[in-house]
Regions:
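A short beta-strand signature within small-molecule sensing/ligand-binding domains used
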Residues: 143-153
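Juxtamembrane membrane-water interface segments immediately C-terminal to a transmembrane helix
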Residues: 25-53, 177-183
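Extreme N-terminal signal-anchor transmembrane helix of membrane signaling/transducer proteins, especially
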Residues: 1-26, 189-193
Length: 193
């Protein structure tokens, strides 16, 4: 084989490998990027919901007040949304509210009333005036099926009266991550050749 042809093929091999590795970096960055965006949205929503829950929490009617009724109504809605070709039919947030000891006083799914959440990072840190969040497996030990929890303080003026944790399954964004990764791979394959 002639030297010129070898150099030509070597150059394209190096460029192709470089493009492949750059493409892999992009693909691997999609998942954490989407999860960071989801966390940011959960922070906003948790803080809005914490403000909305404060009046009922302060009045001692967090289990049967307006906040809970409004949440129940929202969970019953048929959303009928299509987001980037993926259907969104229902609200998939889970909301828990704990008292100052970290004991669950409200759970939108009704599963964990009375449970001590004071050692979970989202509640623990928020009770100490810090930002609290965690991602935990749905089934202990199963790291493939996790839920992101973001907490916000429930306040009466400046006084902390509880912690609202907003949880969303990471699986709810998996279709978007997979679609983005496929798109990057497809475009990268076209670019490489």
């Amino acid at each position: 084989m002639r030297l010129g042809l070898r150099l030509f093929l070597g150059f394209f091999l190096i460029v192709g490998l470089a493009a492949f590795f750059v493409m892999r970096v992009f693909v691997n960055e999609v998942k954490p990027g989407v999860r960071q965006a989801m966390e940011s949205t959960l922070v906003d929503a948790a803080n809005v919901l914490a403000v909305m829950a404060a009046e009922d929490m302060k009045a001692g009617r967090i289990t049967d007040g307006k906040f809970v009724r409004d949440l129940a109504e929202a969970r019953q809605r048929e959303l009928g949304a299509t987001i980037w070709q993926f259907p969104k039919r229902r609200v998939d947030y889970r909301i828990t509210i704990t008292d100052l000891r970290g004991i669950v006083v409200f759970d939108s799914e009704g599963r964990d009333l009375g449970r001590d959440n004071s050692r979970w990072n989202d509640v623990y840190r928020t009770l100490r005036g810090e930002y609290g969040a965690r991602s935990s497996p749905v089934v202990p030990g199963d790291k493939t099926n996790t839920v992101m929890h973001v907490a916000a303080p429930v306040r009466d003026g400046d006084r902390l009266i509880g912690v609202l944790s907003l949880a969303q399954p990471n699986a709810s964004i998996d279709p978007f991550i997979a679609a983005s990764q496929r798109s990057i791979m497809r475009q990268g394959a076209w670019l490489i050749g």
